[in-house]
Amino acid sequence: MAIRRATQAEANYIVQLSGKVMKESSMGYAENGVQNAYNLFMPIIQNGGYFLIDIENGRVRGWILLATDWNAVKGQVMGNLLSAYVFPKFRRSGVALDLATAAINELKALGIRTIQINVFDGNPSRILCEKLGFKPVSTVMELDIQ
């Protein structure tokens, strides 16, 4: 197993894959769609964000997108963990923990003091986030009006 920064070609491939798992990773909130993934993640990558990938025997087992951004509320640059995904075959094997830890360490090396992650309601990855020390800070609520 190796965790490393994705190449440009791998990042494009992962964005395409992300479009195919959006519904699952958002607990049904977002529809699958490669174009949706490009619209969501390419601006982040163009602004300096990048994927870390877990790769074994030439096969991607999972990924996490990390980025930094100015947070006006906190008055500081903060890290963001986005688009974390592990293929079902590799879940419960430590891949997600290894990816998240590597991403946290990379952000820490950049001098980032606070990291945020968005976890959709009902997503079991919330347990891992809490294990890593993440705490809820807000709840996004939504009302559909017809």
Task: Indicate where each model-derived feature is located.
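A short beta-loop-alpha structural element at the N-terminal edge
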Residues: 2-16
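Conserved GNAT-fold acetyl-CoA-binding loop/helix
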Residues: 19-40
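A short helix-loop-beta-strand connector motif used in the catalytic cores of GNAT acetyltransferases and
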Residues: 42-53, 62, 80
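A conserved beta-strand-loop-helix scaffold within acyl/acetyltransferase catalytic domains
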Residues: 64-73
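Conserved acetyl-CoA binding element of GNAT-fold acetyltransferases
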Residues: 75-88, 142
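Conserved acetyl-CoA-binding loop-helix of GNAT-fold acetyltransferases
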Residues: 83-86, 92-105, 131
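Conserved active-site alpha-helix within GNAT-family acetyltransferase domains
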Residues: 97, 120-139
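Conserved GNAT acetyl-CoA-binding A-motif
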Residues: 107-120
